From Swiss-Prot:
Pfam families xref list: STL11_N, Torus
Gene responsible for this protein: SLT11
Record keywords: Metal-binding, mRNA processing, mRNA splicing, Nucleus, RNA-binding, Spliceosome, Zinc, Zinc-finger
Upper taxonomic lineage: Eukaryota, Fungi, Dikarya, Basidiomycota, Agaricomycotina
Native source species: Cryptococcus neoformans var. neoformans serotype D (strain JEC21 / ATCC MYA-565) (Filobasidiella neoformans)
GO biological process: mRNA processing; RNA splicing
Principal location class: nucleus
Molecular function GO labels: pre-mRNA binding; U6 snRNA binding; zinc ion binding
Protein name: Pre-mRNA-splicing factor SLT11
This protein's GO CC annotations: Prp19 complex; U2-type catalytic step 1 spliceosome; U2-type catalytic step 2 spliceosome
């Protein structure tokens, strides 16, 4: 009698070809790859997977960082972990399309989740678990405008030589690293933790910069006064605070009910004041709603603007009153 199959057992992943973007693959149509089965542990699901290594041209050697299953779940490249369709970070894509991160982060739940999705992908006609067509029109238009249409091969360049920066490199032309000083916005190789954050779309500095610039271009620049934590929804239909709260959570899945301090609706002006507990959450919600072109409440699209600080009472009147003669 054969042994019972344990569905919770940590498995392995085997593939014949990687899932890569055009930039990571390089300009050479005759690239040669080295294949190593179970060569490394996937950065996301921690399963041994087939690792591919290649030289994309004159740049450094590159390799796959996550397994093909995790890449199919998110629709990303196995090396740079950017979206395959738009070439943008997953945090930008998910914010524009109002997608919720459903993948669990705990070890046991990840294994169970991966195994179930593998079974679903095996039965699906295209073998994929990510559907990029299910999205609102405004979000897709924003992604198309921000998408990089041509491959950016400079991303494949070797890293900067740290010894050259210190003035201690003695290898000269034989050094495999770049001999130039780093720029202010140039970052080093991301760590494993930052790769995982990029995959799940959280705490990604590149995505935050893209979303902030997009919000500023649409008039949603965050005010300098850090005490302002209010967003104003304009052009609302007849609704109550529960409708506004449900629309906000649906458009911004990262917003929890506890993050919203209060919602005040002014029916005469068809607007609502949404007060957040923290300024960072208000900024993140503003960036996401700007990417979606506003927020839809009860079938009507509403405009989003930042609130203003309340005018402080002038202390001069009180001082003048106290200084008046008796």
């Amino acid at each position: 009698m054969p042994a019972k199959h344990d569905i919770n057992k940590v498995g392995v992943e085997s593939s014949d070809f990687p899932i890569l973007c055009e930039t990571c693959l390089g300009p050479n149509p005759y690239v040669r790859m080295n294949k190593q089965e179970f060569g490394h542990e996937c950065k996301v699901c921690n399963r041994p997977f087939t690792v591919f290594r290649w030289n994309p041209g004159e740049g450094r050697m590159k390799k796959t960082e996550i397994c093909t299953t995790c890449a199919k779940i998110k629709g990303v490249c196995q090396t740079c972990l950017l979206d395959l369709e738009f070439g943008l970070p997953t945090q930008v894509r998910d914010a524009a399309l109002a997608r919720k991160a459903q993948a669990p982060s705990s070890d046991i739940n990840k294994q169970y989740y991966i195994q179930n999705l593998e079974a679903q992908m095996a039965e699906s006609p295209d073998g994929l678990a990510y559907d990029s067509e299910v999205a609102n029109r405004a979000g897709r238009e924003m992604l198309k405008n921000l998408a990089r249409t041509d491959p950016y091969y400079k991303r494949n360049r070797p890293h900067i030589c740290s010894f050259f920066v210190k003035g201690e490199c003695k290898r000269g032309a034989e050094c495999p690293f770049r001999h130039e000083m780093p720029k202010e916005n140039e970052t080093q190789k991301p760590s494993q933790q930052s790769l995982v954050d990029r995959y799940y779309g959280r705490n990604d500095p590149v995505a935050k910069k893209i979303l902030s610039q997009n919000a500023e271009s649409k008039g949603l620049k965050a005010p300098e006064d850090k005490s302002i934590t209010t967003l104003l929804f304009l052009g609302l239909p007849q609704c109550n605070d529960s409708h506004v709260r449900a629309s906000l959570v649906g458009a911004c899945p990262f917003v929890k009910p506890s993050d919203v301090k209060s919602i005040s609706i002014v029916e005469a002006s068809h607007c609502a004041f949404v007060n957040f507990n923290q300024r960072s959450m208000a900024e993140r919600a503003a960036d996401a709603l700007a990417a979606q072109g506003g927020i839809e409440v009860e079938g009507k699209k509403a405009k989003i603007v930042w609130g203003r600080a309340r005018p402080q009472k002038k202390a001069a009147a009180a001082v003048e009153g106290s200084a008046a003669p008796a």
